[in-house]
């Protein structure tokens, strides 16, 4: 987690090739600014049903991970679709053993199903069409305090205000870190061929760290 937050700080305050990266990011969202390219970035147009996926190999841990990305959604204002950012599952298994990080009704939604759903929704809404958001989801099911098992950060600050907050049981195994499961970016892994629930927006600097919260 410290590595991902440090990376966020570097992206906001640091320089690459003598240029402030945050200025580059902001430049892409302003119509009056020059056009820039952001390294390690991709545009997901939901109409094209895009996604990236891979099958998980041998994990470092089946109980701990950290995921981070910059995201600039292009669909806002009570969009009722569930927009998949990152997920894992056995393809075709829609009932259990699947994990989701998504954008839904302008809030961040994080859910894990280890037999029953443990769902977290932010109270804060994200509706600025000119903004990039940096998201970190850090997981450690071995923590004795339930709220420490799933931590969410937006733009470097931990989110603690939720409209829904249910946590996985202690020591649960999670699909995102399980060998043989499918990980997907931009779509739900359990239904990877479906045209539904695709992310519509930009993602950049996507990082997944296995075995660390």
Name each region found by the language model.
Residues 48-111, 143-146, 212:
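Extracellular glycan-recognition modules
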Residues 67-75, 135-137, 203-208:
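Short hydrophobic/aromatic patches on beta-strands that form ligand-binding or substrate-lining surfaces
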Residues 111-134, 193:
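Short, aromatic/His-centered strand-loop micro-motif at the edge of beta-sheets
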Residues 176-203:
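Extracellular glycan-interaction patches encoded by glycine-rich segments
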Residues 18-63, 105-118, 179-185:
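Low-complexity, glycine/proline/serine-rich flexible segments
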Residues 154-181:
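Short, solvent-exposed beta-strand-to-loop segments that form ligand-recognition rims
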